[in-house]
């Protein structure tokens, strides 16, 4: 049996996941990161994207996160996300509409337009779409 480690994924609103896992994959500030039992202690920021969780008995669960912090300690992994949603809770139609609206705003900016903010929101919606597409496979 594979070695396991405790994982807690929480957002400001809710606890999304808590349990023993074999490993997780997440997008950190420096790129893709895999964590499993025995990983060196680590603290890094995370980007909008998917947390791929391999649970204790090998089942996979996908969680969308947008911003936050990943902390790895001996025996424990914490994902403290600004936003976190189970992949199944994402509404594809709403995400597609948000993406279209953001692309239109970027193409035709208003006087009080904040490009950096719009680009960050667009990156989040694209990450959500990637996760939805991965769920379909």
Curated annotation (Swiss-Prot):
The keyword Cell membrane applies. Transmembrane segments: none annotated. Keywords: ATP synthesis, Cell inner membrane, Cell membrane, CF(1), Hydrogen ion transport, Ion transport, Membrane, Transport. One of its GO terms (cellular component) is plasma membrane. InterPro entries: ATP_F1_dsu/esu_C_sf, ATP_synth_F1_dsu/esu, ATP_synth_F1_dsu/esu_N, ATP_synth_F1_esu_C, ATPsynth_dsu/esu_N. Coiled coil: none annotated. The keyword Cell inner membrane applies. Its main location: membrane. It is found in: Cell inner membrane. GO terms for molecular function: ATP binding; proton-transporting ATP synthase activity, rotational mechanism. It is a peripheral membrane protein. Belongs to the ATPase epsilon chain family. Produces ATP from ADP in the presence of a proton gradient across the membrane. F-type ATPases have 2 components, CF(1) - the catalytic core - and CF(0) - the membrane proton channel. CF(1) has five subunits: alpha(3), beta(3), gamma(1), delta(1), epsilon(1). CF(0) has three main subunits: a, b and c. This is ATP synthase epsilon chain. It comes from Pseudoalteromonas atlantica (strain T6c / ATCC BAA-1087).
């Amino acid at each position: 049996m594979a070695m396991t480690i405790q994982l807690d994924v929480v957002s400001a609103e809710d606890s999304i996941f808590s349990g023993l896992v074999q490993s997780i994959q997440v997008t950190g500030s420096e790129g893709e990161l895999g964590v499993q039992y025995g990983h060196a202690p680590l603290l890094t920021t995370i980007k909008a994207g998917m947390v791929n969780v391999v649970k204790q008995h090998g089942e996979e669960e996908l969680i969308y996160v947008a911003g936050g912090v990943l902390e790895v300690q001996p025996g424990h992994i914490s994902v403290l996300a600004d936003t976190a949603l189970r992949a199944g809770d994402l509404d594809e139609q709403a995400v597609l509409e948000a993406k279209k609206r953001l692309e239109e705003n970027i193409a035709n900016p208003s006087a009080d337009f904040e490009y950096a903010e719009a680009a960050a929101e667009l990156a989040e919606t694209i990450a959500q779409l990637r996760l939805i597409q991965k769920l379909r496979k």
